[in-house]
Structures are given as C-alpha cells and as structure tokens.
UniProtKB/Swiss-Prot annotation:
GO terms for cellular component: cytoplasm. Gene3D superfamilies: 1.10.286.20, DNA helicase RuvA subunit, C-terminal domain, Elongation factor Ts, dimerisation domain. Residues 80-83 are annotated as: Involved in Mg(2+) ion dislocation from EF-Tu. The keyword Secreted does not apply. One of its GO terms (molecular function) is translation elongation factor activity. Disulfide bonds: none annotated. SUPFAM superfamilies: Elongation factor Ts (EF-Ts), dimerisation domain, UBA-like. The keyword Nucleotide-binding does not apply. This is Elongation factor Ts. It is found in: Cytoplasm.
C-alpha cells in the first residue's frame, strides 16, 4: 500500500479543485495513483475533467511565421516576463521562426539550423543571447504545417507584437479555392482552435486511450445511478457522442456562430471559394503549457531568513 503524503494530497487538490478529505480518500482508493485518483473524483461527481493539470507557468513567447504554403510556430521560454518584453528577445524569436520555415519544424532541426544574424546554429545563438541578456532561455517546442495546394492560416493571441504572443495556432486548409476566401475562413478557424483547444480534427482521430478513459469515467458515473446495465450502456453511448462532439474540431459549435459547427461553417464558404476545403492539420501552442513554475513559499522564506 502506497503511503499517502500531504504533498500528494496537495497536488491532487490543486489539480482537481476537490476538498482535502476527498482527495485523501481518492488517493487511498487508488493506491496513490494521481491520474486514477482524478478519475475516481470525477466518477463521484466531486471533480470535473482535469483541466488544471496542464498548468501554464513558464515565461517567454510563442512566434509564428508563414512562407507560401507553409507555416511554423515556435516556443521560446525565458525565466521572466520582463525578458520576454525585451526587444532583443522578441527579435530572436522572430528570427528563429523564420529559420524554422527552412526546416521540417522539429526542435532538433531548428536548433541545428543556421541563424543568419550570427552565422551560428540557432542553439549557439540562443546561448549567446543568454550570455548577453543574463537569463536562461530554452527553445522548447516547434512545429510546422504545409499543404501543396491551399493555405496554412495562423493566429496569435495576446500578441506582444507582429507574429509573437502567448498563444499561437496553425491550421492547414487543403483546397484549390480562392486564397482570400481560404485565408479568411482559415483565420476564423484558427481563432476557434485558440479558444476551444480541440483534441483532434475529427471524432475518429481522438486518441483511443483518451476516449477509453472518458468511457470508463462515464461508466462509473452511470453505475452510481443504480440503473440496469442495458440502460447504463445507452447512457454511456450518449455521453460519448457528446464528448466527441465537444472535443473534435469539425463537430464543435463554431465560436463565431454557435448555431453551426466548424465543419458546417467551412462547407458554407466552399461555394465562394470555388472548391472543396479539407482541414488537414492543426497545431496549438500555449506558452508554458505543462511546465510547472517553482512557487516560493513566502512565509517559509521569511522564517528561514529570521532563523539566520
């Protein structure tokens, strides 16, 4: 039996928003398994889906760049927001995004590519910037999307300047249609992705493990009702259909016009575009996603200083 520590209870409480005693019981019931404990709380109706687990803490900026039928998004982290507002830092991430356009978009490829302003690799150029600015920096994530015909639309939220901000989105639309129409609907869909963070483009593309986890939670919730298994199965199937509608891009209610789905909104502009439109890819990077920032205990710091 795993020992349930105060730190574990605190972590579960922060992730689930549930009470301390509920968290302690959940951990005891699941032998200290954090993810299973979250599911246990959800099944009991004590906690909602774990939306706090990907806590955003790191500073820095997200940068996007476009060239022809290709676009990239990169994340450059810094220790403080003050440095992220520095012109040199902003120029650096814009430059890195431009370099990323010449690669396959992976962090390794971008890091190894030559940064024109210095003639060195991007990785070494970041090291030089660290020495100059005096703060650690990390090229944490990078991604690229490309279509042979169509557009890759971009959107930056909380923009700190041209092409840089706290959240960046790419969405690839494959089409032979009018570019102006494609860019317009593409930007709207990118804004939608920024707002809703869909798990996949289509329901059938949702990760099987994620879907299975949801189904198991729904089964436990339904069993709490005490209804027969046949009824429970129908209840779960209904909840799963709703789950897929809510997490798959094309079946989500369009934030710009909630009366229709994203898929329907795209279909509506096909006539104006003069060709069919297919969403072939999407990327959404939120600054610091999944990175825990060290939080100092002010009271403990004062106590430590007082003790000399």
């Amino acid at each position: 039996m795993t020992e349930i520590t105060a730190a574990m209870v605190k972590e579960l409480r922060e992730k689930s928003g549930a009470g301390m005693m509920d968290c302690k019981k959940a951990l005891a019931e699941t032998n200290g398994d954090m993810e299973a404990a979250i599911d246990w709380l959800r099944a009991k109706g004590i906690a909602k889906a774990d939306k706090k687990s990907g806590r955003t803490a790191a500073e820095g900026l997200i940068g996007v760049a476009t060239m022809g039928h290709k676009a990239v998004v990169v994340e450059l982290n810094s220790e403080t927001d003050f440095v992220a507002r520095n012109d040199a830092f902003q120029d650096l991430i814009r430059g890195i995004a431009q370099v990323a356009l010449t690669t396959d978009g992976t962090v390794d490829a971008v890091s190894a590519a030559t940064y024109p302003a210095t003639g060195k690799s991007v990785a070494d150029s970041i090291k030089d910037a660290i020495a100059t600015i005096g703060e650690n920096m990390t090229l944490r994530r990078s991604a690229a999307l490309e279509v042979p015909h169509g557009v890759v639309a971009t959107y930056v939220h909380n923009a700190a300047g041209d092409g840089i901000g706290k959240l960046g989105v790419l969405v690839a639309l494959k089409s032979e249609g009018d570019k102006a129409v494609l860019n317009s609907i593409g930007r709207q869909v990118a804004m939608h992705i920024a707002a809703t963070n869909p798990l996949a483009i289509r329901a059938e593309e949702v990760d099987a493990a994620v879907a299975e986890r949801e189904r198991n939670v729904f089964i436990e919730q339904a069993r709490e009702s005490g209804k027969p298994e046949a009824i429970i199965e129908k209840m779960v199937d209904g909840r799963m259909r709703k789950f897929f509608e809510e997490v798959a891009l094309l079946s989500q209610a369009f934030v710009i016009n909630p009366d229709i789905t994203v898929g329907a909104a795209i279909k509506e502009v096909e006539k104006e575009a003069g060709a069919s439109i297919e969403v072939t890819g999407m990327v959404r990077l939120l600054l610091g996603e999944g990175v825990e920032k060290e939080e100092s205990d002010f009271a403990a710091e004062v106590a430590a200083v007082a003790k000399g």
